[in-house]
């Protein structure tokens, strides 16, 4: 029963990460799996589950605060291209994304679809 709860939790973490950030699902899944595994181990060893939950929540608050302090806005076309190129693993795709974002603006929507047409 606990394994099923843990699997559902990890699945939900991956879905929320994808919905909010669109990236980072692997990292979020690995972190969630480690938290579930170590949490169950600690509870089995006698730790208070509510105390454990409160500790995790405090850690999440502190980590979020630290990340937000070090975050940098991505504003210029060049910054967008560099960031997109890292995510895509390809500079030419990063440039295409930056160009598309330049055309639609900050509130615009870009839809990417796989083509079944060879060479287009």
Swiss-Prot record:
This is Chaperonin GroEL. Forms a cylinder of 14 subunits composed of two heptameric rings stacked back-to-back. Interacts with the co-chaperonin GroES. GO terms for cellular component: cytoplasm. One of its GO terms (biological process) is protein refolding. Its main location: cytoplasm. ATP binds at residues 23-27. It comes from the Bacteria. Its EC number is 5.6.1.7. It is found in: Cytoplasm. It catalyses: ATP + H2O + a folded polypeptide = ADP + phosphate + an unfolded polypeptide. Together with its co-chaperonin GroES, plays an essential role in assisting protein folding. The GroEL-GroES system forms a nano-cage that allows encapsulation of the non-native substrate proteins and provides a physical environment optimized to promote and accelerate protein folding. The keyword Electron transport does not apply. The keyword Acyltransferase does not apply. Keywords: ATP-binding, Chaperone, Cytoplasm, Isomerase, Nucleotide-binding, Stress response. One of its GO terms (molecular function) is ATP binding. Belongs to the chaperonin (HSP60) family.
């Amino acid at each position: 029963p606990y394994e099923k709860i843990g699997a559902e939790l990890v699945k939900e973490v991956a879905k929320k990460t994808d919905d909010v950030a669109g990236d980072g699902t692997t990292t979020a899944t690995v972190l969630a799996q480690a938290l579930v595994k170590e949490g169950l181990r600690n509870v089995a060893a006698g730790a208070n589950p509510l105390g454990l939950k409160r500790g995790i929540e405090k850690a999440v608050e502190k980590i979020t605060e630290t990340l937000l302090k070090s975050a940098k806005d991505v504003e210029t076309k060049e910054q967008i291209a560099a960031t997109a190129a890292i995510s895509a693993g390809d500079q030419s795709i990063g440039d295409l994304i930056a160009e598309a974002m330049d055309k639609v603006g900050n509130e615009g929507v870009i839809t990417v679809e796989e083509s079944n047409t060879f060479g287009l």
